[in-house]
Amino acid sequence: MKYSIFILCILSLHFSYSQGNNVTLLSQWSDSSLPPVYDGESVYNEVWGITKDGIEYAIIGSRMGTHIFRVNSSNQLVEIDFVMGKHTGSDAIHRDYHDYQNYLYAVCDEGPSSLQIMDLSFLPDSVSVIYDDDSLITRSHNIFIDTAYSKLYSCSNKNSGGSNALKVLDISTPTNPTFLYNYDLVNHVHDAYVMNDTAFLNCGGQGLKVVTELNQSCIQIGELSTYPQKGYNHAGWLNGDKNIYAMCDENHGLDVKVLDVSDLNDIQVKSLFNSQMGDAPNSIAHNVIIRNNIAFVSYYHDGLQIFDLSDPLSPQKIGHYDTYIGNPAVSYAGCWGVYPFRNGDKILVSDRANGLFLLGFQPPPVTVESPHEIFPNPSNGILYFFKDHGLYADYTLHIYNGLGQQLMQIEGKADYTQLNLENYKSGLYYLRYVSNVDDTMFISKFYIQ
């Protein structure tokens, strides 16, 4: 009876949609003096990150070139250098980056442009361009470096002599790249993920191709040409166990695909997921990187979206941060690229209009399998609420002390929510979950030590 009265006496409040969930803004940079590209708004493009001598660095491209930042001890972005691109016209929309050993490689898909190689050995003070040449690469859409085999894969190449789908360079001498071979058995390669001489190629309308090298040429060892919600196969990333691959189709309203690639002769789609935001029918997943089975996805309209892929059959949304609060119907506006540092607690995100973001994130410390759970329990005041993916990701959490007094209320838009109760004393507390979509409600108890 007391339990029933306790429930009935609780009052419900409603708060507006939050820009972020489980993700915090640490630092943000933009430069109002930079000119936009031809659409009048977009200035920035790809983002990349490196760690050198224990210091984290951020790289972002703009219409004008490459901006390099240090992440200081206060988690603030400090710009330390800028490298002008060979091409800086109003059409300079696409730049891409990858690092190898002590060098940063940069390309542009408008031009005439070039391959630029920057020496990073003088960081944190400056960088220097030691190679800027268009003989091997004039225009390239994306690059990826297979560090184990010292090869640079250049996608969708264009030069005065024509174009080719994929070009592979030898960078075993990092400052003196040399040509190895072209791969043109597909019409187009938009992006690539390469590990140990095996390349997962995103081939637009031709789907996913997997190739490896044989006698200085590529042979196909796997493909997925037909799959649910197929569109323009744009980008993907392999997990650390090399058995799960997340794949984005760059089309309005198409879900991200989770693939089982343990058998390249029989690639299987295990699940699909999307941002679960209000404008999901218009949303476009652009790029993805996986760290420790957590997928960090950049969505044009919806910003950074974070999903736990520990169970590839049921991806769990565990965080988001919207970098673009403008009209969600604007096509291809907003978040462009994402780069989580190795442990996933700091994330770099680029927004086409709003520049570079450094975001903080606390990955789930454990995996739980019950429909809903609070962990750790008991805790020191920092704890996590986790719900089953089958429950709607639109809910309100009410926190009460042992006397039934409400202490806080949190709007949830993800399967996983961090709770900070460090300022509350030790004892018994209650969490009440209320769905904002249906009549689902439950109460759990937890303890603060």
Stretch-by-stretch model annotation:
Residues Y17-P364:
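Feature marking well-ordered beta-strand scaffolds used for ligand recognition
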Residues K2, K151, K445-I448:
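A general lysine-centric signal
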Residues M1-N21, N377, Q405, M441-I443:
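Bacterial Sec-dependent N-terminal signal peptides
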Residues S370-F375, S379-Q449:
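C-terminal outer-membrane/trafficking sorting elements
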Residues F361-E373:
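Low-complexity, Pro/Thr/Ser/Gly/Ala-rich linker/spacer regions in secreted
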